């Protein structure tokens, strides 16, 4: 570059820089004021005319007009002359309200402004703004003046100012100033007030006015607040911040929003809301920010001011990119309180956006917003006065349906209650009497929380002979500590138990008095930590059937009798007699007796007759009520009659040593006295001779000396009657009775022999069934020590616990059948306490079954009882075993059939993870098994025997009618990878339970796993009586086939079945699950070569949908050394960890609430689902590359063996799913028997087990699409119109009468 060019360029740069600086200075503070033409401060125009103003300046110009409502405005450029810029303002057709200031200034600087005031004279509108109604004028308390803005359109217009009601003071009038451009300026004192102010003027004899109202404004401002306090919004939402403050009447607050110290000019809303008129006024200003971005987060400041007084408040706005909904317990989730107190549940909710639906539930029932018992505010639930019925589970369900977010948590409320005694409310009024020398039972039923303890006490009455009232002899003495020195009744038993009464658990204590002989007071005291309650039971012993009565009830005319009024001692007192005329019988004519159990008062009546004995009345004071009671004598007078005989004695011949009985039936008034004579000598009682009250004579072991004439004489005051007979003794006295001796000797010998036989049998036999414990189950399951049928015969069957009436069982369609039995669907009415009618499965024999078959089914029943109840096994519900009717076993009904069929049916609906939009319906297994995952090392159900612990079905899975109606069909839900892990986890739990009961399954496969409601799987065909048949004909029919595909090498080669061989089968079962029901070892002949390869360590490749962790678990189960395989407890731990990892990977939170209850409470409310993962929904590729990738290098698979040998052993004839093989001699007929390949259960369904899948080589995989099409986020939801039908349940878990491998 030349020096010249360089100099030119430098000069040009300096020139440009100088020009810019000069331009900036010109535009800055050094700019000259614009020039406005025509000149002058004011201009007068006339209405309808045209106003023209010209403004010249150095930069672009800007006009500010007097009114925006001008008729027509035109701004145009004009000749610039000396100035660079010129603007002309032209307004045509001027109006009166165009009067005002017109200003011109530079656009970029308003500091330099020129203006002029234009009057537009209009005779019809002398005022620029005229108000016919009072227009408010505002002035603060400390303002020195105020302006009445009645400007005029003509500068010389004469205007008068008037005030009404409150006239102006003279000094104020003198200080008033008039300016046609402003109006009147009026001096103002702090407490001056003018109600109405009027500006008056006249034009051409026409009067014009404008009315104003002065309002004195306050300077008070307080309680400035911003709502919401902690605003949180999502990107794209609208942010609304409301700033409010309080002032008094006539206060005017000015609000101003700032963000990052800049004034905000966004859309806003201004409103005022009076809280209480004339005292407090709340004014507010809302800031609305639509379509929020991340740049809008930060601190927003609101300033509220009245004149010079200001208040300021700031809030921090947080902006999130993604929605979320979380809820936790603010305090404890368990609350224990007492009645009458206030309880509040305050969950901590963290959600953006806020939930659009908040519902509280009490024990699964939605709480109404108008509930009088519960008060809801925001997320909180308040119980003002807790009652006992409020105890239970409270659940808050939060949802944002638009975002697909659902959460809930539960609180448990325990209401502690002071003890209450049930008998106090239902006991009869007044004390009761207790019969002497008899057994009595006293019951005390107490309710309280915590459950109260009951203690019995005793207080005897003072035994002094002259006392008629029970004065307690001692303080209350505990029953177990009563000293022998105190009077007491012998106690047989005192026991307490917890029972259900009126749907509440109550403590029921029973005191059994062996014999009643002492009066006193028993009391039961129920005590818990809140207090105690005592019920007194007066125990008055009585030796008569009635507590208050008159004796006797009959008499003979002419006799002297004694009427006795008798009452129970301590219950009645002050006995008094009244004659038929109502006169009180004097005390000297009565006799009072106080006995241990009665008090009586007697009077003597001589020569009684029917006329004067009627109407005697006894009165007494009932002590407990202090009321007088009476009873009237109902004496019956019988006329005197002589005795007569009903029949005469007859002569008899009596064998020696026999018994002689002579009856003398005589009647009379009074009752005659019977006397016996023998040969005219009175007969008296002695050894072998009995005289009964009714006149019967009994002589035992008659001898020759007893022969003679026996005479019966009946006598009373009316005379005597007699009859006689001759008694002859037949036989010799000294000759023994041979028949008796023979009979006695024979009986004694038979008894002795029977006892010896029983002792001999008991010595030979093993321990009885009563001694069978849990550990003995291994012997039951091991037929080598004792035949299984003999062991089962010794197992107990408790008919009281398990027997179910056949008439309450309604049989339905047949679900499956086998060679000798069948399984039918049935409805059982009242089989449990949860549901009225329950769908069950019934196993029963076919018509014509043999006795051996009956014994086999009975053996299965006993083993089911002994094994016990568990959630993940098919459980026993009852049985019908009564003779004369069919033998039936009632078990749980699993509506979705076996797991193998179900998995195959779901191949088109399998997704790895649920999509984020939540449209795909998710399996509910996660929800139902949340507690299993949480406590995976604990047993889900009782591991004890149901025979000893009782059986109550888990309520979470009961199929009551309401829940059954609301259960959603699993076939309408997609199947996820998490469900497959969950199935494996549940089977491991069930097998862990069976292993703890020392039960070996021996046929663990997907076909023997049933699927029930709520995605619960149950193991069937476990350890039952498979070897009870020894009939060789049955074996020849095919039941000797073995499930080789599932068998461990030691079971195939050495016939050894252990829990570890079940672990091998569990690994094959996992392979079935993660291949969605495919047949194991696809494409292989199950022959001797296969078994040898298996023993050498060749294994299956990974299934299509497994991960490396899952496949490694399978390989661990297939370890060649049984002792190196994991136990089922370890598998539960491992799968539980995988299941938890799956949950955490998807960001889900399992929440313990029954979805059916929510649906029941509110049909519109969907079941709470988990927050879904944002990753895409897709299926794992089904090619071989996936399987090889996750296979350990040290494991050789059958696919590699096939490729090495250069052979393709795909089974073309339909390889058996069950993989059942025969002995080596029978392997030639394998293809012919494939239709029978599966072990035939005793009541299995006739179902073919052929594999319908095509098994391809790895090289051929690319030619065919995968089994399951890939799903995107949009098509992951199911077609609502698709009709899904579940296959019939597979009930092949019934007794399989197949002999074990030998």
Swiss-Prot record:
Keywords, alphabetical: Angiogenesis, ATP-binding, Cell membrane, Developmental protein, Differentiation, Disulfide bond, Glycoprotein, Immunoglobulin domain, Kinase, Membrane, Nucleotide-binding, Phosphoprotein, Receptor, Repeat, Signal, Transferase, Transmembrane, Transmembrane helix, Tyrosine-protein kinase
Known EC number: 2.7.10.1
GO molecular function: ATP binding; growth factor binding; protein tyrosine kinase activity; vascular endothelial growth factor receptor activity
A single cellular component GO annotation: receptor complex
Location of region: Disordered: 1159-1179, 1266-1292
PTM field: Phosphorylated and activated by vegfaa and vegfab.
Tissue expression as described in the entry: First expressed in embryos between 5- and 7-somites. At 7 somites, expressed in discrete bilateral stripes both anteriorly and posteriorly, and in a transverse ectodermal stripe in the hindbrain. From 7-somites, expression seems to extend caudally from the head, and in both directions in the trunk region, until by 20-somites, expression is detected as a continuous band from the anterior head region to the tailbud. Concurrently, cells expressing kdrl in the mid- and posterior trunk regions converge medially.
Domain Ig-like C2-type, residue spans: 34-115, 143-206, 222-318, 326-412, 419-542, 545-636, 643-728
Membrane spanning residue stretches: 741-761
Glycosylation sites: 69, 97, 242, 265, 291, 326, 370, 380, 408, 453, 466, 505, 517, 532, 607, 611, 630, 648, 655
Family annotation (InterPro entries): Ig-like_dom (IPR007110), Ig-like_dom_sf (IPR036179), Ig-like_fold (IPR013783), Ig_I-set (IPR013098), Ig_sub (IPR003599), Ig_sub2 (IPR003598), Immunoglobulin_dom (IPR013151), Kinase-like_dom_sf (IPR011009)
Residue spans, topological domain Cytoplasmic: 762-1302
Extracellular side: 29-740
Active site location: 1003
Residues that coordinate or bind ATP: 815-823, 843
Catalytic activity: L-tyrosyl-[protein] + ATP = O-phospho-L-tyrosyl-[protein] + ADP + H(+)
Membrane topology: Single-pass type I membrane protein
Reported effect, residue 845 to R: In y17; abolishes kinase activity and causes specific defects in artery development
Disulfide partners: 55-104, 150-199, 243-302, 444-524, 565-618, 664-712
Primary role: Receptor for VEGF or VEGFC. Has a tyrosine-protein kinase activity. Combinations of multiple VEGF receptors are required for development of different blood vessel types in the embryo. Involved in angiogenesis, specifically in VEGF-induced sprouting of new blood vessels. Particularly involved in artery formation. Does not appear to be required for hematopoiesis.
Quaternary structure, from the entry: Interacts with isoform VEGF165 of vegfaa and isoform VEGF171 of vegfab.
Protein name per Swiss-Prot or TrEMBL: Vascular endothelial growth factor receptor kdr-like
Species of provenance: Danio rerio (Zebrafish)
């Amino acid at each position: 570059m030349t020096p010249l060019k360089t100099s030119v360029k430098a000069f040009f740069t300096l020139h440009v820089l100088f020009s810019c600086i000069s331009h900036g200075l010109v535009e800055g503070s050094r700019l000259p004021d614009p020039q406005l033409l025509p000149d002058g401060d004011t201009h007068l125009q006339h209405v309808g005319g045209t106003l023209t103003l010209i403004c010249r300046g150095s930069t672009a110009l800007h006009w500010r007009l007097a009114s925006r409502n001008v008729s027509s405005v035109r701004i145009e450029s004009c000749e610039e002359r000396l100035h660079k810029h010129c603007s002309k303002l032209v307004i045509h057709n001027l109006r009166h309200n165009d009067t005002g200031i017109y200003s011109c200034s530079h656009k970029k600087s308003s500091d330099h402004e020129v203006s002029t005031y234009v009057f537009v004279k209009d005779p019809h509108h002398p005022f620029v703004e005229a108000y016919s109604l009072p227009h408010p004028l505002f002035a603060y308390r400390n303002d020195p003046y105020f302006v009445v803005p009645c400007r005029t359109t003509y500068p010389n217009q004469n205007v008068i100012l008037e005030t009404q009601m409150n006239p102006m003071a003279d000094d104020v009038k003198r200080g008033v100033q008039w300016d046609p451009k402003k109006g009147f300026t009026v001096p103002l004192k702090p407490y001056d007030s003018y109600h109405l102010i009027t500006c008056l003027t006249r034009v051409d004899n026409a009067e014009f006015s404008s009315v104003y109202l002065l309002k004195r404004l306050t300077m008070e401002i307080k309680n400035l607040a911003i709502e919401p306090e902690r605003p949180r919004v999502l990107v794209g939402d609208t942010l609304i911040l409301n700033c409010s403050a309080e002032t008094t009447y006539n206060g005017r607050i000015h609000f101003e929003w700032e963000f990052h110290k800049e004034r905000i000019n966004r859309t806003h809303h201004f409103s005022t809301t009076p809280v209480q008129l004339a005292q407090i006024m709340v004014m507010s200003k809302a800031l609305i920010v639509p379509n929020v971005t991340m740049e809008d987060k930060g601190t927003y400041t609101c300033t509220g001011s009245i004149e010079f007084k200001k208040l300021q408040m700031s809030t921090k706005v947080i902006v999130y990119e993604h929605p979320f909904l979380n809820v936790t317990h603010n305090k404890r989730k368990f609350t224990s309180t007492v009645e009458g107190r206030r309880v509040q549940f305050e969950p901590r909710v963290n959600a953006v956006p806020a939930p659009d639906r908040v519902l509280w539930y009490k024990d699964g029932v939605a709480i109404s917003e108008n509930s009088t018992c519960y008060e809801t505010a925001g997320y909180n639930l308040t119980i003002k006065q807790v009652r006992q019925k409020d105890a239970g589970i409270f659940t808050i369900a939060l949802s944002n349906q638009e975002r697909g977010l659902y959460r809930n948590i539960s609180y448990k409320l325990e209401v502690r209650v002071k003890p209450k005694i049930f008998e106090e409310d239902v006991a009869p009024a007044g004390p009761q009497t207790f019969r002497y020398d008899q057994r009595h039972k006293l019951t005390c039923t107490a309710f309280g929380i915590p459950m109260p303890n009951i203690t019995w006490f005793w207080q005897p009455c003072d035994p002094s002979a002259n006392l008629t009232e029970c004065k307690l002899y001692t303080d209350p003495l505990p029953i177990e500590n009563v000293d022998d020195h105190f009077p007491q009744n012998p106690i047989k038993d005192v026991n307490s138990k917890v029972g259900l009464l009126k749907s509440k658990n109550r403590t029921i204590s029973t005191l059994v008095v062996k014999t009643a002989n002492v009066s006193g007071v028993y009391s039961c005291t129920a005590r818990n930590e809140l207090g105690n309650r005592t019920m007194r039971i007066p125990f008055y012993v009585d030796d008569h059937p009635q507590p208050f009565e008159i004796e006797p009830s009959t008499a003979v005319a002419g006799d002297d009798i004694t009427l006795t009024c008798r009452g129970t001692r301590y219950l009645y007192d002050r006995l008094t007699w009244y004659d038929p005329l109502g006169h009180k019988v004097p005390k000297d004519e009565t006799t009072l007796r106080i006995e241990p159990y009665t008090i009586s008062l007697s009077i003597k009546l001589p020569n009684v007759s029917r006329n004067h004995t009627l109407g005697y009345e006894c009165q007494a004071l009932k002590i407990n009520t202090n009321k007088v009671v009476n009873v009237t004598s109902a004496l019956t007078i019988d006329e005197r009659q002589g005795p007569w005989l009903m029949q005469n004695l007859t002569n008899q011949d009596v064998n020696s040593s026999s018994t002689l009985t002579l009856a003398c039936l005589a009647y009379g008034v009074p009752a005659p006295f019977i006397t016996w004579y023998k040969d005219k000598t009175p007969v008296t009682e002695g050894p072998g001779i009995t005289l009964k009250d009714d006149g019967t004579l009994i002589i035992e072991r008659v001898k020759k000396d007893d022969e003679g004439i026996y005479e019966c004489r009946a006598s009373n005051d009316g005379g005597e009657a007699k009859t006689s007979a001759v008694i002859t003794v037949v036989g010799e006295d000294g000759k023994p009775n041979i028949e008796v001796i023979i009979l006695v000797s024979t009986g004694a010998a038979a008894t002795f022999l029977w006892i010896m036989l029983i002792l001999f049998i008991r010595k030979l036999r093993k321990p009885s069934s009563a001694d069978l414990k849990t550990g003995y189950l291994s012997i039951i399951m091991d037929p080598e020590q004792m035949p299984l049928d003999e062991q089962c015969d010794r197992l107990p069957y408790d008919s009281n616990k398990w027997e179910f009436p056949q008439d309450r069982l309604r049989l339905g369609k047949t679900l499956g059948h086998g060679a000798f039995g069948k399984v039918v669907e049935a409805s059982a009415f009242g089989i449990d306490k949860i549901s009225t009618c329950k769908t069950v499965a019934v196993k029963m024999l076919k018509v014509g079954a043999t006795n051996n078959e009956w014994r086999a089914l009975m053996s299965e029943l006993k083993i089911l009882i002994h094994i016990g109840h568990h959630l993940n096994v098919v459980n026993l519900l009852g049985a019908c075993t009564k003779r004369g009717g069919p033998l039936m076993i009632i078990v749980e009904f699993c509506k979705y059939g076996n797991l193998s069929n179900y998995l195959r049916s779901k191949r088109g609906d399998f997704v790895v993870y649920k999509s984020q939009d939540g449209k795909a319906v998710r399996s509910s297994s996660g929800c139902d098994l949340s507690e299993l995952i949480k406590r995976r090392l604990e047993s889900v159900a009782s591991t004890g025997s149901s025979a000893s612990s009782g059986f109550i079905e888990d309520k979470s899975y009961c199929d009551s009618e309401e829940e059954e109606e609301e259960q959603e069909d699993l076939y309408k839900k997609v199947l996820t990878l998490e469900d497959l892990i969950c199935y494996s986890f549940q089977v491991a739990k069930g097998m862990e339970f069976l292993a703890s009961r020392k039960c070996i399954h021996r046929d663990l496969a997907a076909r023997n796993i049933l699927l029930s409601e709520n995605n619960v799987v149950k193991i069937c065909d476990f350890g039952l009586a498979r070897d009870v048949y020894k009939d060789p004909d049955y074996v020849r029919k095919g039941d000797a086939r073995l499930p080789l595909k599932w068998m461990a090498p030691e079971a195939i080669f050495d016939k050894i079945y252990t829990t570890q061989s079940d672990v091998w089968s569990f690994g094959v079962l996992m392979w079935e699950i993660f291949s969605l029901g495919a047949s194991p070892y696809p494409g292989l002949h199950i022959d001797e070569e296969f078994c040898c390869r298996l023993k050498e360590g060749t294994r299956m490749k990974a299934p299509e949908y497994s991960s490396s962790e899952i496949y490694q678990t399978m390989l661990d189960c297939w370890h060649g050394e049984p002792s190196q395989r994991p136990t089922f407890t370890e598998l539960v731990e491992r799968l539980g960890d995988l299941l938890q990892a799956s949950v955490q990977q998807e960001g889900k939170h399992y929440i313990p609430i029954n979805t059916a209850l929510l649906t029941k409470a509110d049909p519109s409310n969907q079941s709470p689902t988990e927050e879904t993962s944002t990753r895409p929904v897709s299926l794992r590729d089904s090619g071989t590359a996936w399987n090889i990738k996750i296979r350990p290098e040290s494991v050789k698979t059958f696919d590699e063996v096939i490729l090495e040998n250069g052979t393709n052993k795909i089974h073309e004839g339909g390889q058996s799913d069950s993989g059942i093989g025969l002995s080596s001699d029978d392997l030639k007929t394998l293809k012919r028997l494939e239709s029978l390949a599966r072990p035939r259960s005793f009541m299995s369904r006739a179902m073919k087990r052929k594999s319908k899948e095509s098994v391809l080589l790895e090289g051929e995989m690319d030619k065919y699409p995968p089994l399951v099409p890939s799903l995107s986020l949009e098509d992951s939801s199911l077609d609502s119109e698709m009709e899904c039908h579940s296959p019939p349940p597979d009930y092949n878990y019934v007794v399989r009468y197949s002999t074990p491998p030998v």
